Amino acid sequence: MGDSDDEYDRKRRDKFRGERSAGGGGDSYGRGADRPDRSRGRDDWPDRVRPRQDYRDYRPPPRDRGYSPAREGPTVKRMRGDTWGDEGRHRFGAHDGYGMYGYAHDHFGMHPTVGPYGHQHATHQREPVVSGDMQTQPCMMTLKQFLATQDDSISDSDAITKYNEYKLEFRRQQMNEFFVAHKDEEWFKIKYHPEESQKRKEEQLSFLKRRCEVFLELLKSKEIGKVSVDASNTDALLRLLDTVVIKLEGGTEEDLKVLDIKPSVVEAAARTPATLNEEKVKTESKVDATAKELAVKMEEDSSKQETETDVLSVPQSEEDARNGNSKIKEELSKSMDDGNENGDKSKSNDAQKSEKEIAEVEHEAHKHESEDRKKRSRSDSGSSSSSSSSSSSSESEEEKDERMNKEDNEDEENMRIPEEEKKSDSADTMDNINRDKEVDEGKPVCDAEDLNTADDRDDNADQNKEQNEFEETTKDKNSSDPVNDENKENSDKKSQQEGDSKAETIDLAKDPADGGSRALHRTSSIFLRNLAPSITKAEVEAMCRRYNGFLRVAIADPLLERRWFRRGWVTFKREVNIKEICWNLNNIRLRDCELGAIVNKDLSRRVRPVNGITCHKTVVRSDIKLGAKIAHNLDDKWGLWKETPTAASGTGEAGDKNGSEVQPEESFGLQSKNPVLQNITDYLIEEASAEEEELLGLSEDSKKVSEGELIERDPQLIEVLDRLILYLRIVHSVDFYNHCEYPYEDEMPNRCGIIHARGPPSQSKVMSNEIQEYIRTFEGKMASFLTRMVDIDETDMKKLGAKDAEAEVEKFITANTQELAKDKWLCPLSGKKFKGPDFVRKHIFNKHAEKVEEVRKEVEYFNNYLKDSKRPQLPEHPGNAKKPGSEGATSATANASVGAGGYRNQPFGMSHSYAPMYASYAAASMMAPNPRGRAGFGRGGRMGGPDYRPVIHYRDLDAPREPDEFL
């Protein structure tokens, strides 16, 4: 009786298992200790990667479960190497070498089923190598494939005509499918929808006009002329850009004073909680010394208080001295009930204050002076109260005096302290949990001075809380107490001093309500890495508006490589706790999409240098010409200077002569009303003494070509160029020296964040051909700004399948007119029945006019998409670009390309544009023939030099062998 399937698999797996053990050799079957371990786990190998195969496939006669021999590759013996482990697998985790080229058996023997490191391949062996997420159009039929579908009697001209029609119809179908797939997405509507696109254009035009107003304001104030676009002038450039941002945010001249403050001060005012924790750790080493100093000061204050008490009042007994100490304890500690631990609590309170960063000696002096005055007043009140009541004990006298003084302070603060200080004090009475809650909500973190004033407010808040507890019992006593007037004066002085100390702490990153300077150019932002195409900007704004300090949202255009996912930037005010907000956003899924929120760092280098050759006079003159063309082209695109704007009413007579006429000629100084382009042609004309050189026989050009020339700066030309560069950067968001445009910059966290400037010039001579090559290269990079957007004409649009609005309306009416029976028609939109189709038509126009209007808008929507010459669409299939009959040429280039960049040769006859039939880390090919001139595995040379072909000769076997005949 034959073995079962399980027994067969067990024997086959255990055949070489002992030889692959970690011991390295010996008779594995002689070791009885290892056998039980192997037999126990041989039936269940969880880390086994190789798929199980039916052992019947190895038998010569075909069985019922075997595959066709034509659809399966030959069985190849696997090769063992030094890298094989005890489990019979390659150490990299790739598949065993059972297949043709290191792959497992599949329905097709040469199918790549497993990729490097055991990953699955996403492409067929005959499909071109593309990324897994890349989407392409379907493969179009070749001419040969198309002719196979046609009649054999078709002529050549008809075949070519029909094939061209097929290609055109294929393009129509692909564009229509792309439109239907993306027409409901926000980014697509912003580009082509008749209503959404118009709103977007108006919004962008308002941004441009606002930027233009700010630029003209700075131009009139001569702020633009003071700045040169050089990398050595970084501070002035950054100040100008920050000034523009503050003015765009609606800032005033008071807000511009923030730019005059050193960055270190601004950074100290905008510290994060992590920074405060670091500073707190640094100051812990100084806590003990500060506590000792404060203890000495408080002892001196207590001694002064005792002497002043002796002078102002009758000498008191030991109870009065203890009464005075209790007043000191009242001001320094939060607890009032423990009278036996006055010294310990005063020291602990001092240490607590020093831990909260007591930074300024002046602030401490003011605080101690107020405490001295308060103690003197309380000692007087304590002495008078103790002398008036003789029947009660000393402890009861102390409690009564404390309650009376508290109530006096409360009444005085309610009368004298302004309304704003009341609100701040009431807010400070919250406990630690509420304070943590405020931090979670994103409120700003105070600096060292704010911590000092907050500490004082905490003490006052504790006093107010205790005063409220005894309010009912002491109200009558305080109203009849003659000491109230003196206490009111002292508390009034104390409140004024506290108000002065609060006014000294100003956080520059905050937005104060009293109209102080605001750092509007500094923001905090969060970067959203993944936004599904279905997520709208309004949804992101609604999600982020719940957090304090929210400003705006910017969403980029989708990318094909990222499956049309978009990226977003959420901008907040500078003082918010941006990390807490980012953590909350990471816990939110919007439309079942993880946002991938991370904190966006500040810009590292805002002014970046470029080649120093840009300072040369020849290059500057070329850049002026190029920049003037770009500025004129962008102004004409948005229509900024077509009509006389109010901001540029006094720019000169040249702008008034033209009125609102628009002429297509590119005449900069005469036809443009832009003040930057006025009289710019005077600087574009080059002057040279050509006649003098000709008469004298001089040849300056030949000297320049042979010897080169030093970089020469022309300050007048550079001033004109800088004005152009700053106009493009501020108004149109075009970084001239970086030859790029920063899109949707008005919604980004950093407006006018980066600019490229001229670097330091070289001290060596520059050849003329180098200058011309630089100018030519720079013009090529800026060519995209010089070409005007031209829409497709009507004839081409009809070829691409442009729709007619009236025809589509008729189709809509026909589709919604259904005949039920004779003289019985139905309108499916409303469910009403009519006697004829004309009545249904009239009903649709009257009752469903909005549906008809939607059809017209849909037609305009689609036509706007077709009209765009740079419309987004899926890339063509790589197989469409392949020319038929070029397989021989591509195979040669394939071998060259793989030999240069690959690890081993491609399979024979494979093109370089297709995926190889073996994985990068799989077993090497054992059956593919090698190209000529390369050694194989079993041939001489060991993959060394060329292996020469044997000489072919012919010999008659019946003839005798000649002595010089070679074999």
Swiss-Prot record:
Q: Which UniProt keywords apply?
A: Nucleus, RNA-mediated gene silencing
Q: Which domain of life is it from?
A: Eukaryota
According to the UniProt entry, the coiled-coil residues are: none
Which residues does the annotated region (Disordered) include? 1-84, 296-518, 645-669, 868-893
Molecular-function annotations in GO: nucleic acid binding
Please give the GO cellular component terms listed in this UniProt entry: nuclear body; nucleoplasm
Q: Where is the composition biased (Low complexity)?
A: 380-394
Tell me where it resides: Nucleus
Q: Which GO terms describe its biological process?
A: primary miRNA processing
| Regions of compositional bias (Basic and acidic residues) in chain numbering | 8-20, 32-66, 296-307, 319-374, 414-426, 433-446, 460-513
Function of the protein: Acts as a mediator between the cap-binding complex (CBC) and RNA-mediated gene silencing (RNAi). Involved in innate immunity via the short interfering RNAs (siRNAs) processing machinery by restricting the viral RNA production. Also involved microRNA (miRNA)-mediated silencing by contributing to the stability and delivery of primary miRNA transcripts to the primary miRNA processing complex.
Q: Which family does it belong to?
A: Belongs to the ARS2 family.
Protein name from the UniProt record = Serrate RNA effector molecule homolog
Q: Which species is listed as the source?
A: Anopheles gambiae (African malaria mosquito)
